[in-house]
């Protein structure tokens, strides 16, 4: 019996434990940020422990950082978390991509951009969207603060191996339909828990034809499908992305191992899902979890249970309405899901020569300083600002109500982020998840439109 991609990487990292029982995994890369690391560092101090592998631990500042005046942090808790990480990095010898540094940004942007994220690695971070790195053929997953401390102390974690679920995606994406629409559609069709207990391997011709940035968008939202892990087979697209990046110093010697990272033809999957994207439409969420979404041409569904009723009440919507009926007030282009250069380029095609609708506050937050510099080199900052968008500094920003960037209560926001929970973008904020192109078109038109009609 052959092995899946996930099985191969898992097996290589098992230090102790039997099949079917919790196993001790070696961790190749530990990414940290200011929110989930302070207590873990304090635990080391209390027990007088050293950091086991500071050379495999990298820090960035993202969740709490302001995106307007980055060195003027008014919130006391946010400021404390940021300064604490800066001091902890100094005390324990951790490399930090600090405020204002050339590489600072959202943790799931920084890893790939610097070449830290590589095929075949085990990667952890105290953040639920760590599966983003699985797009490179890595086992990457989010962990809690107690686990962060365990990795600090031992560079290992006890984990129970999940089952394997293959999502085979084929067909050519229509113009105006993107990777974000693929993952939103899957979650809408199969629910927010269909991946629970599984490692999701995304495969098929559609995946092979996607850029690395688009692949990361899909893996980023594996957790919204209930899965701890989401990954893809590394190929020439992957290798070309990694090659030449600062931390990819063992590129040539690693290729032999990387080229073995695929699921064997006779590998067993516990479950298989088939998807043809040929007729896929742009997706829009209407409710308060990512499962509550529709294809653009479809009306919002009938109320089936108390959760639906609560969602409609919170969102101020009702069954039978369509996405174009939503009265938008904010548009947010950003987050670890869709704040990469290709996302901003796609959005720029939509808004070029246009003006943001007078009823809309539109914000662009590049996911990292690297993306910001590259976008500005292309003149995208001027294009967005000329259209009426705010052009901000890198950070998690409006993805979560943990920093100054928040959506006002009761206001509907077209967002390229990954979660539309109650209060996610601020108290009473009403979030609608969409692709960057859909968000850009909404900013110009003041409402959702079928972006397939305007995509360039």
Curated annotation (Swiss-Prot):
Pfam families: Aconitase
Binding-site residues for [4Fe-4S] cluster, renumbered to this chain: 336, 396, 399
Listed CDD domains: IPMI
InterPro entries, per database record: 3-IsopropMal_deHydase_lsu, Acnase/IPM_dHydase_lsu_aba_1/3, Acoase/IPM_deHydtase_lsu_aba, Aconitase_4Fe-4S_BS, Aconitase_4Fe-4S_dom, IPM_dehydratase_rel_enz, IPMI_cat
Catalysed conversion reaction: (2R,3S)-3-isopropylmalate = (2S)-2-isopropylmalate
Co-factor binding comment: Binds 1 [4Fe-4S] cluster per subunit.
A Gene Ontology molecular function term of the record: metal ion binding
EC number: 4.2.1.33
Cofactor or coenzyme needed: [4Fe-4S] cluster
Keywords recorded for this protein, A-Z: 4Fe-4S, Amino-acid biosynthesis, Branched-chain amino acid biosynthesis, Iron, Iron-sulfur, Leucine biosynthesis, Lyase, Metal-binding
Family: Belongs to the aconitase/IPM isomerase family. LeuC type 1 subfamily.
Quaternary assembly: Heterodimer of LeuC and LeuD.
Annotated function: Catalyzes the isomerization between 2-isopropylmalate and 3-isopropylmalate, via the formation of 2-isopropylmaleate.
NCBIfam families, A to Z: leuC, PRK05478.1, PRK12466.1
Name of the protein in question: 3-isopropylmalate dehydratase large subunit
């Amino acid at each position: 019996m052959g092995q899946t991609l996930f099985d191969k990487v898992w097996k290589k990292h098992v230090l102790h434990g039997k099949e079917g029982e919790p196993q001790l995994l070696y961790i190749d890369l530990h990414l940290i940020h200011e929110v989930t690391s302070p207590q873990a560092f304090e635990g080391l101090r209390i027990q007088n422990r050293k950091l086991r592998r500071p050379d495999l631990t990298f820090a960035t500042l993202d969740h709490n950082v302001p995106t307007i005046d980055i060195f003027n942090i008014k919130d006391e808790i946010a400021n404390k978390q940021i300064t604490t990480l800066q001091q902890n990095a100094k005390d324990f010898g951790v490399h930090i991509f600090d405020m204002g540094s050339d590489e600072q940004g959202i943790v799931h942007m920084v890893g790939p951009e610097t070449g830290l994220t590589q095929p075949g690695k085990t990667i952890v971070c105290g953040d639920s969207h760590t599966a983003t790195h699985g797009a490179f053929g890595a086992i990457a997953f989010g962990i809690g603060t107690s686990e962060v401390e365990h990795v600090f102390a031992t560079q290992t974690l006890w984990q129970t191996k999940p089952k394997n679920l293959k999502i085979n995606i084929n067909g050519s994406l229509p113009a105006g339909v993107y990777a974000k629409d693929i993952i939103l559609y899957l979650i809408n069709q199969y629910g927010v828990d269909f991946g629970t207990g599984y490692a999701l391997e995304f495969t098929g011709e559609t995946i092979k034809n996607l850029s690395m940035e688009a692949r990361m968008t899909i893996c980023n939202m594996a957790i919204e499908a209930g899965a701890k892990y989401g990954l893809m087979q590394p190929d020439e697209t992957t290798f070309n992305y990694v090659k030449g990046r600062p931390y990819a110093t063992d590129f040539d010697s690693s290729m032999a191992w990387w080229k073995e990272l695929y699921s064997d033809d006779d590998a067993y999957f516990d479950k298989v899902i088939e998807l043809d994207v040929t007729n896929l439409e742009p997706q829009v969420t209407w409710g308060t979890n990512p499962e509550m979404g529709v294809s653009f041409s479809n009306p919002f569904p009938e109320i089936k249970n108390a959760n639906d009723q609560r969602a409609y009440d919170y969102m101020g919507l009702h069954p039978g309405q369509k996405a174009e009926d939503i009265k938008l007030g904010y548009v947010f282009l950003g987050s670890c899901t869709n704040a990469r250069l290709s996302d901003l380029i796609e959005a720029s095609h939509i808004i070029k020569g246009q003006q943001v609708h007078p009823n809309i506050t539109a914000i662009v937050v590049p996911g990292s300083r690297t993306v910001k510099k590259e976008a500005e080199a292309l003149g995208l900052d001027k294009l967005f600002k000329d259209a009426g968008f705010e052009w901000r500094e890198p950070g998690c920003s409006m993805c979560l109500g943990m920093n100054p960037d928040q959506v006002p209560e009761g206001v509907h926001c077209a967002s390229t982020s990954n979660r539309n929970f109650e209060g996610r973008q601020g108290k009473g904020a009403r979030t609608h998840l969409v692709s960057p192109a859909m968000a850009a078109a909404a900013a110009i038109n003041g409402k959702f439109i079928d972006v397939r009609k305007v995509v360039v």
